[in-house]
Amino acid sequence: MSSEAGKVIIKLPKTSIPYKYVEPTLIDVDKLVNHEELVEARLRELVDKIRSENAVDMPIIVTPIPGTDKFLIVDGHHRWAAVKALGYRKIPCVIIDYFSPEVKLKTWLPGIIGEVEPVLSEASRRGLKISMCNYDPNTLGEIDVKLLEESSFIVLGKNLCRAISGGIEGQKIVSQVLNELNMKGLFTLVYYGELSDALEDLKSGWLTYLFIRKILTKEDVMNYVKKGLVYAPKTTRHILPFYPAKTYTPLSKLA
């Protein structure tokens, strides 16, 4: 094994987003819609935490889904799922205006420190087409929009460019492959919040391969969840004007 099994690095720029107290609104868990698949280990961790604290430490962030009586979970998928798994009817929420310019939407960009061939081989085995492309970190701004739209990811490395087919649905397959091979210790998995940071590490050689994808719009997200669909974990990265301060809502209020 070339790296520590399950090692994941998160790389985000430093920010100064403030914490703000907002009186939470209790919303029925069945009125809430998640937009990303859940990670079972994280869900189990939060179930145990909520049970031991006998409270939900902080509200989740939600926004109305236009044309429905439901709310999109912007941040807090696993807390919502944990409360639901524990059998409670309501969860503390902070409702935001999703389309406010203060709420920004970006995407997580996966990268690996290690060999990419096992990822490409397994993605191909699971039905995705791998094709050659001619981009490098210095020509990234010139990538064809149509190619990004049709690809699940474009993989860049030193002297390598591969487009993986599948679009949004293909991203679920690739993300699953990345997680599975990472757990086997084949490589270290790195998630970047900003493309510029990822490219810097790729050019320096610290990062071996970078997976880039189309950046979603807020309209994309809303339309996708209205179809009853969910993205792969760590697809969307929402930047909010504030973090909700902890309120420790007792479970007794959620029955």
UniProtKB/Swiss-Prot annotation:
Q: What GO biological process, any one, is recorded here?
A: chromosome segregation
In this protein, the active site sits at E36
Instruction: Give me the residues that bind Mg(2+), please.
Output: D75
Q: Which CDD domains match?
A: ParB_Srx_like_nuclease
Keywords linked to the UniProt accession: ATP-binding, Kinase, Magnesium, Metal-binding, Nucleotide-binding, Transferase
Broad EC category? transferase
Where does this protein have coiled-coil stretches?
Answer: none
SMART domains assigned to the protein according to its UniProt record, in alphabetical order: ParB
- Name its co-factor(s): Mg(2+)
Q: Which GO terms describe its molecular function?
A: ATP binding; kinase activity; metal ion binding
User: What's the catalysed reaction?
Assistant: L-serine + ATP = O-phospho-L-serine + ADP + H(+)
Spans traversing the lipid bilayer: none
Which InterPro entries does this one have? Chromosome_partition/occlusion, ParB/Sulfiredoxin_dom, ParB/Sulfiredoxin_sf, SerK/SbnI_C, SerK_C
Gene Ontology annotations for the cellular component aspect, listed alphabetically = chromosome
Q: What is the annotated role of this protein in its UniProt record?
A: Free serine kinase that uses ATP to phosphorylate L-serine to yield O-phospho-L-serine and ADP.
Record's PANTHER family?
CHROMOSOME-PARTITIONING PROTEIN PARB-RELATED
The record's comment on protein family reads: Belongs to the SerK family.
Write down what this protein is called.
ATP-dependent L-serine kinase
Species name: Desulfurococcus amylolyticus (strain DSM 18924 / JCM 16383 / VKM B-2413 / 1221n)
